[in-house]
Amino acid sequence: GVKGVLACMQLADGKLLWIKSYSKDFGAKWFGGNAPGSSGTAASRHGNNGPPVTDDKYIYAPAGGHEGASLVCLEKRTGKLVWKSGNDYAAYAGLMIGELAGVKQVVMVTAANMKGYRAKDGRELWSVPVKTGAARNIVTPILHGDTVTVASHTVGTFQIRIRNSGTGQVAEEIWRNKNVKTNITTPVLIKGHLYGLGTSRGRNSDFVCLNHQTGEVVWSQKGYDDYASVIGMGNTLLVHG
């Protein structure tokens, strides 16, 4: 939640089964104003908003503890800590779990970076910078094959490919489109194309279609808000904005 509380409740009656505090248990700081590393003129942060994700017996949560608990893995039924890793402050982006270059991992976009953590033990596998003037990122990364695509209102939209190197992994940039600066809406991937909002111009954005392999704009359409939601249903797009 906004104040950094992760809770598990029984669905039938709402009984609280376990609860964790990001600040007390993992050393996270709550931000109600400008986040560390921001320009000081950006919109205020509103606490811890990145959603957790479950996988098998575990739940992964972007706790944002900058002293070894940026990302935490807990037992889903008990809330017991399995591992913690990383030193970055949290962002608003959702976590993604997938296999990249043969390694199952959790991809996390933090306040200043995008990182891959090995799912079984939290080992950091790779990292690329996603620095913004506001020290916050919102768009959830898109995993496809061994590639990860992400966007920011400062750096634009870019894609990396993960490959194994020695005992670890490296991230290689495939393309970057600096003109498509998606701020809030996560694009959807359908049949080799990314669909989402482009650069915001004060509550007025273009809806754009990008080639997933090259990052080139295929087409664009004006007249959308900065906060439109996009849902892909087969060959149909539902766009609210």
PLM feature spans:
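Noncatalytic, solvent-exposed loop/strand surfaces
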Residues: G1-G241
